[in-house]
Design a protein with these regions (language model features):
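Aromatic/acidic polysaccharide-binding cleft in carbohydrate-active enzymes
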Residues: 1-18
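Active-site proximal loops enriched in glycine and acidic residues that flank catalytic Cys/His/Asp
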Residues: 2-6, 79, 92, 142
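Active/binding-pocket-proximal capping segment
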Residues: 18-23, 105-107
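Disordered, acidic Ser/Thr/Pro-rich linker "stalks" and the adjacent N-terminal cap
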Residues: 21-85, 91-99, 118, 122-124, ...
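Short, surface-exposed beta-strand/strand-loop-strand elements in extracellular ectodomains
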Residues: 98-110
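Beta-sandwich interaction modules
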Residues: 115-149
Length: 161
């Protein structure tokens, strides 16, 4: 929801309109290419009847579920070739509740994993921004959860600076 003030004419000021158009263009360009699509995806575990392919199908009604015995569910994405990125996106499947308490994100560079972020809660969608790096892969690890991890979508993007 946007809280846009109107001016004395009852209109949104031209400067506000220009800023909104710039924001729309930024978002359109940032999320135009999901570098995760078509890449090798591995998960630490997958519950019976589910598939990790749900993470990249853009369908908010499909989802991946970790096994109940997995204390730190991990999603690993290995890229065919290094690509410059700076934004990771993950979405919990909220009809089953918000479950994630904390997580970490690592990038694979020159054959070694490097932690770039630690965070708490995800909810509907979490965008994690980090310094632009040419990466060979990413690893997302749930470090604390209320129940099994359940995610509907993920992505890897390059936002303009």
């Amino acid at each position: 929801m946007l809280n846009l003030p109107v001016d004395t004419r009852g209109l949104v000021h031209e400067n506000e309109v220009a800023n909104l158009k710039a924001l729309a263009e930024f978002l359109k360009e940032t999320f135009a290419v999901n570098y995760a699509k078509g890449q090798q995806l591995k998960t630490s575990t997958t519950a019976k009847g589910y598939s990790n392919t749900a993470l990249l199908d853009d369908d908010l009604k499909s989802y991946w579920v970790s096994q109940s015995k997995d204390p730190s569910p991990t999603i690993e994405l290995l890229l065919e070739k290094p690509v410059e990125v700076n934004t990771f996106m993950i979405q919990e499947y909220l009809p089953l509740g918000q479950r994630i308490k904390s997580f970490s994100l690592e990038v694979l560079r020159n054959g070694a994993w490097e932690k770039v972020y630690e965070g708490s809660t995800i909810g509907n969608k979490r965008l994690v921004r980090f310094d632009t790096k040419a990466v060979e892969g990413i690893r997302f690890t749930v470090t604390d959860t209320k129940d099994r991890a359940v995610f509907s979508n993920m992505g890897l993007f390059k936002a303009l600076n």
